[in-house]
A protein has these predicted regions:
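Basic, Lys/Arg-enriched alpha-helical interface segments
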Residues: 1-73, 81-100
Length: 100
């Protein structure tokens, strides 16, 4: 069964600012999320679940991975909703401006 993956309005605007290569990497990540759910696998660099972030409730499932290493490093952050099998990508951009 596939998951519903959508980008927030903010993430859509951020995606438009990415280079062509980064847009393709984001596309590959979204495809992995659709088919594998919130855990796209260890092949994604620095993939981790967030715990204890400001504003995060105990049952919130927030995750991230790096899209491109180097300077600047680009990351993608998403929320997983297991009960409805939905994933919301809420940030795509540089590590320096990431909401964590």
């Amino acid at each position: 069964m596939t998951w519903d993956v959508f980008l927030s309005t903010k993430a859509l605007k951020q995606k438009d600012k990415l280079s062509k290569d980064l847009k393709f990497v984001l596309f590959l990540l979204v495809e992995d999320l659709k088919h594998k759910g919130g855990n796209p696998g260890n092949q994604w660099p620095n993939y981790k679940k967030f715990k204890g972030l400001k504003g995060q409730r105990k049952n919130d499932d927030w995750r991230h991975c790096h899209l491109q290493k180097g300077n600047p490093t680009y990351v993608c952050c998403w929320k997983v909703f297991e009960d409805t099998q939905r994933i919301e990508v809420y940030y795509v951009g540089t590590h320096e401006n990431a909401p964590y």
